[in-house]
Structure formats: structure tokens, C-alpha cells
Curated annotation (Swiss-Prot):
PROSITE patterns linked to this entry: PROKAR_LIPOPROTEIN (PS51257)
Subcellular location: Cell membrane
Transmembrane segments: none
Originating species: Bacillus subtilis (strain 168)
Sorted UniProt keywords: Cell membrane, Lipoprotein, Membrane, Palmitate, Signal
A GO-annotated cellular component: plasma membrane
Bias (Basic and acidic residues): 23-46
Positions of S-diacylglycerol cysteine lipidation: 19
Name this protein carries in UniProt: Putative lipoprotein YvcA
Annotated gene: yvcA
Cell membrane recorded as keyword: yes
Free-text function comment from the UniProt entry: Required for complex colony architecture.
Length: 241
């Protein structure tokens, strides 16, 4: 199973161009305001010179050209269901993304840090008006199955969400490669403000190029992932309530 996971991750890197729970309540993910002219409608020359804006598909999700934190901008789902921080070097992956009606949306993306030789792969799925989304145990069983995980999840709570998180380190002993490991973080963010509303997430970090030094640090990986998880904010239409 580990060998299959590693091969899948390696293929993902090749196909994509070689390819702490901190409190972020003050982050503007809680602010529904947007720019008068959206980034997707602007001239790329006037946008930040980073992949998140220079990639045509990715900038469709960008809320503003304002940097929320150093290296991070604000992403909004196509269904306008949630917002979260997005790395400036992140790029949207169409083959791992989908839009299903008005109640489900998946967004896949990745980023590559040339300085550290670390590839970051992310995938989030938004659920609305789905009864199973209101059952953390059911959702975590689904997440565990997708990530070949049999352990427990850590729960934390913010003002309007409950966050469930698990992590694991995969070491691929049967692969002849120097950097034969990766760190994965996955779980579920459930709205406590509205029923049947949540976001499933999975993030993996691994070394991309075997013939280059790699600085994959577990603490830095955890901090990066937790920053994104904690930034997830649901956009609830009060008129519907």
C-alpha cells in the first residue's frame, strides 16, 4: 500500500511541472468584501508576479491582490461556500478539481519551493446540505479510508468551526530513493454555525527531485498546513436562513 501511495505521489509531481493550531480569526477570511475588479478580470501584468495570479485558472479563485500574510493570498471557492489562505506559489490542478451541482466542490492544487526542493500537494472538498457532512465520525471514516489511516484525530474548536486533524509520516523502504518519505495531514472542518456544512482536506509534502538536496522539515510542514486549515472560513448566506 505504501509503495502505491509513493508511486501516486511521484506521478503527481511529474505531471505538475516536475511537479500549532494558530488562531487566524483576525484573518480577513472572515471578511466577505472583495475588490471592485476581481483579479481574474485584470491584466496579468498588473497582478502580483506569482503563480497564484499568473496562472489563468488559479487566479479565478483569488479574491484580492492584497497579501493576507507574507506569501499568502485569499482563495474563494466557485460556489462561494468558503474561503481560505492560499500560497503565492500555488497552482490549481484541473484534473483533481470538480464542481458537482450546488452542494459539492473539490479544489486540487500544488506548489513547489525550489529553495527547499519540497513539493506541497493540497486537496479540499466542500460539502453543503449533505446530511453526512453533519456527522464527524462518518466524515472521518471517509477521510481515513482515502488516506489509509487507522488512528485517532485531534479535535480543536474555533468560534464557528470544529477542526479534526490527523497526520502521518510515510517511509517507503521498498523504494530505491534517498528522500523516500513524505508527511501527510488530513481531516475535516465542520461548521458549528450551520448544519450539514463542512470541508474535507488532505495535504502532503514530499521531496521532488532526488538529485537535489531536500529540506523537508516536519515542524515547518506542520505549521504550513495548520495555517491553511485554521484559515478555512464558511461563507453563510444569512438570507437563506
Amino acid at each position: 500500500m505504501k509503495k502505491i501511495i509513493f508511486i501516486c505521489f511521484s506521478l503527481l509531481l511529474a505531471l505538475t511541472g516536475g511537479c500549532s493550531m494558530n488562531d487566524n480569526d483576525k484573518n480577513s477570511t472572515n471578511d466577505n468584501k472583495t475588490e471592485a475588479v476581481k483579479p481574474k478580470d485584470m491584466d496579468p501584468k498588473d497582478l502580483p508576479q506569482v503563480p497564484a495570479f499568473q496562472d489563468e485558472k488559479t487566479r479565478e479563485y483569488m479574491v484580492s491582490t492584497k497579501e493576507e500574510e507574507p506569501g499568502y493570498y485569499l482563495l474563494e471557492s466557485k460556489l462561494k461556500g468558503f474561503r481560505m489562505l492560499f500560497p503565492e506559489d500555488g497552482k490549481y490542478l484541473s484534473r483533481r478539481s470538480s464542481l458537482t451541482g450546488k452542494n459539492k466542490e473539490s479544489i486540487g492544487f500544488n506548489s513547489y519551493d525550489k529553495d527547499t526542493n519540497v513539493m506541497f500537494d493540497g486537496h479540499v472538498t466542500y460539502y453543503k446540505e449533505e446530511s453526512f457532512a453533519n456527522e464527524p465520525k462518518t466524515m472521518l471514516d471517509i477521510v481515513s479510508g482515502k488516506n489509509d489511516y487507522k488512528g485517532e484525530y485531534k479535535k480543536s474548536s474555533k468560534k464557528k468551526t470544529d477542526i479534526y486533524t490527523a497526520k502521518k509520516k510515510d517511509i517507503f523502504d521498498d523504494i530505491d530513493r534517498k528522500y523516500n518519505y513524505s508527511y501527510s495531514y488530513f481531516g475535516y472542518v465542520k461548521s458549528t454555525e450551520e448544519d450539514n456544512l463542512g470541508v474535507e482536506y488532505a495535504f502532503t509534502l514530499g521531496c521532488k527531485n532526488e538529485n537535489q538536496p531536500c529540506s523537508l522539515d516536519e515542524e515547518k510542514a506542520k505549521n504550513k498546513v495548520e495555517k491553511l486549515i485554521n484559515s478555512i472560513t464558511f461563507l453563510i448566506d444569512k438570507k437563506e436562513k
